[in-house]
Amino acid sequence: MTEAPPTQEWNAEAAVDAARQKVQTLLLRETEIGLDQRGRLTVDRGSTRVFLEFYPIPDKRLVYVTLTAPIAFYAPITPELLEHLARNADKWYFGHLSMNPYADDSEYKGQTYVYFTDTLIAEYIDPEELRIRTFAVVDTANALDEEFTQQFGGTRYQDS
């Protein structure tokens, strides 16, 4: 990849649009994809869905893609949940478990959103890597969500 000269302006919005189009074209070769209200590409699998979001890194003139699949919404934050996430966050080849607690001033205080996620740099994505990483994220979340919600509480994507 050839970087633009430092004096040339980089258009983050155009770069994100180009990355989204590239990823969409590559994924359409493999599976059906959707587009949600927030502009995220989506792929459904079993009881969950992977969301692909695109973010610019202006100082690097790159776009990164997050692949995120819900495991549980509204899971109570307990010592057992935190220990499970700490011990198991990175046990997969691709992706990892993560959580995002709901705001303290929300009705869901004391609860968290648990998900499986991975990140790619759009400019360097090739078709095989995109396929493997996308399905690794969504298939892992699909395999984990039922047992996870039974053990720790919360609601699966399919049930939300």
Regions found by a protein language model. Give the residues of each.
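Short, internal acidic amphipathic alpha-helical interface segments
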Residues: T66-Y113, T117
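Ordered, soluble secondary-structure elements with a strong preference for glycine-centered loop motifs
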Residues: E13, D17, P76, Y124-R131
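A short, solvent-exposed beta-edge/loop patch
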Residues: D104-V138
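Short, highly charged C-terminal tails/helix-capping segments
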Residues: F148-S160
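Short amphipathic alpha-helical signal-transduction/dimerization elements
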Residues: V138-D145, T149
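Short, charged/polar surface micro-motifs in flexible loops or helix N-caps
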Residues: S47-V50, P56-R61, I71-P76, K91
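Charge-rich, low-complexity N-terminal segments
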Residues: M1-D59, N100
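Short histidine-centered catalytic/ligand-binding loop motif
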Residues: Q8, T66-Y74, D126, L130
